[in-house]
Amino acid sequence: MRLILSVLVLFSMSLNLLAQSDTATKQLKDVVIYANKFPTLSKNIVQRVVSLTDKVLIQQQANTADILTASGQVFVQKSQAGGGSPVVRGFEASRVLLMVDGIRMNSAIFRAGHLQNIITVDNMILDRVEIIYGPSSTLYGSDALGGVVNLFTKQPQLFISNLATKKAPWKTDGNLVYRYGNGQNENRQHIDINIANNKWAYLTSFTSSSFGDMRQGNKRMADYPDFGKRLFYVARENNTDIIKDNSASVNIQKGSGYTQTDLLQKLLYKPNENTEHLLNVQFSNSSDINRYDRLTETSKGIPVFSEWYYGPQVRNMVGYKLTKSNLNGYFQKMTANVNYQHLEESRITRRFKSNNKDFRFEKVDLFGVNVDLLHHGKLSELHVGVESYYNNVVSTAYGNNIATNVRSAITTRYSDGPTNMSNHAIYAQHTKFLSGNWVLNSGLRLNNVQLNANFKDTALMHFPFTDANQNNTAITGNLGMAYNGADGLRITFGASSGFRAPNVDDLTKVFDTRTGYVVVPNKDLKPEYTYNTEFNISKTTASYSIGTSLFYTWFKNALVVDKFKWNNASTILYQGIMSDVYASQNKAKAVVYGFNVNGSVKIATNTNLAATYTYTKGNFSDRKLNGMNTAMPLDHIPPSYGRVGLKHGNEKWNAEVFSVFNGWKRIADYNLNGEDNEIYATKDGMPSWVTLNFASYYNPRKNLSLGFQIENITDLNYRYFASGISAVGRNYIISCRVSF
């Protein structure tokens, strides 16, 4: 951590020197963002919004989750190599809203633990990523408690010809990309093609990704010389499970490899300047992905599982978007989006030395529609909208004896009868441009969320009920002010509320997140609410920028997994194991607070130093259980984290040396009943770490780009908080992009 402090001190000194020498500062060009769904200038938004537009950062990562990690702006948890669960301001999974091209990715089965859904969006075809920090329920609805991660894929590009012909010519261009990394034997091939004239544009993209077993770093802390070592794995020989010795290659995280295929097709039709029709088709499919953390789990020195893997993760999406501009009447612009998604996921498990293999399958059909209208006034903007989403969930399961091939009944993960969930809302957001460089933001949203779940087979779990129904209505809003000075000084402060209704995963799940620990349904859950205050201040000039964000969130009715009784019993027999009973429950109160400091400084021609640092703290208390107001750690709260980078280059070439770092997460700060996964940490918690990395890109020709990177130069062995797999060791990466 001394290295981190030294870099930050030097960074601060550089800012002071530059501030003294910069006597004639000028404000840099403002950034266009889509946090309000329509294009707007970032200076008109009170909340902190980070826009990631660097194509090198976006497209030269192993997957979309790694974009967030590499940026240093978001903490990302991993249970396996084929995953990545963003944490925004202490909120994760179903409390962070994922969007792709303006369409909700969060479904009724988004769990409260850790997710990997973000990797189903291909980073090779991403155009930009926007991160909205803090409750964003006014415009985005339920789930946007910690914030919103907006993923925008590349748009088809029309070809505007200067030729005076009646029939416009067609133009074809595209990109071929290859990327290889030795740390995981990564092989990725990508192609995208754009075919267009002045009215029609067709974009197709295909990416094939293959990852072998990830090699972790070899340089371990002296206090934890064996941390993360893969000492064994389970193989099946002669119809028997046997433990294989892996001591010769302890840094190879055997079983962590996977493959993935991504396809995107877009069709744009623009008959005139005021009308656009866009058809958006996306498909993502993976191989089986081992749950690496569960495969390393032991009990009394014996592996708990012989098999534990996710089946192919499927995301199919079809969306149609209509955009109208320069409308007659009060509203000048309109967008309408109708979309359908088909999602599939599954979990397959078999305990060590057992012939019984359990299969659990989930399918979700998700239908959505939203309409947004925008009015431009001389000194104000009014954005109103309506949206509706409907989820239909089908959960099935069976057991299979691999020796006799005889099937048996087992518990489904979710309710096995007709199960559906719907979200409906109407909202308005107003922006008022006041005198003296002040901007006022205000908004309101009326939410209604309904859920109906039915349990057909209640015998296996002795269900005390046969259905679970909810109908929740909530009003959320935001109010804030922004000051944008002519000298580049920007100050914002605001308050907002967030809302999340319990979903199918919260209300109906039966599953063991670890051995001897089973989560059961709780039909009496209530919605979660957050009330957030935020203060941001920044200074931007031609030579430097520096800013800080402070936030404090009151979390009411927070859902926390805690001890529970099922049919008046605190332990039950689940999958042959006597297990403690837990369930999601609304706690009395919780708070999450923290800050971010970030900035960049031009230290020489074409040379910039940039840094970001985030600190988050969270706890909850429940007088009913403790008899006193005793604060306990809230789960999902990451340690301090950030990034420092020195970059030099121009359009022809560039190179960057950078560090990504995490602070300590002491075991006393873990939530031992939640999703912090203390069993995959050291006895003292998750140690702090700092990695040193290098990235360079060279463009010898206009249509050719070559890349060379070294991740984790020191080959450090480290692991992100709450993760069950260690990060990659020293990783050499080469890439090549050919444009045509």
Give, region by region, the residue ranges found by the protein language model.
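Flexible loop and strand-edge segments within Gram-negative outer membrane beta-barrel domains
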Residues: 254-260, 270-331, 342-364, 413, ...
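Gram-negative outer-membrane beta-barrel transporters
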Residues: 435-436, 440, 448-449, 552-554, ...
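Surface-exposed extracellular loop regions of Gram-negative outer-membrane beta-barrel proteins
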Residues: 342-346, 394, 399-406, 450-461, ...
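Outer membrane beta-barrel strand-and-loop segments of large Gram-negative receptors
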Residues: 362, 366-372, 423-425, 520-526, ...
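Transmembrane beta-barrel wall of Gram-negative outer-membrane proteins
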Residues: 184-210, 220-288, 314-316, 433-434, ...
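Signature of Gram-negative outer-membrane beta-barrel scaffolds
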Residues: 383-486, 512, 582, 624-629
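Short acidic/polar hinge/loop motifs at secondary-structure boundaries
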Residues: 105-135, 139
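N-terminal periplasmic "start-of-domain" segments of outer-membrane beta-barrel proteins
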Residues: 30-58, 85
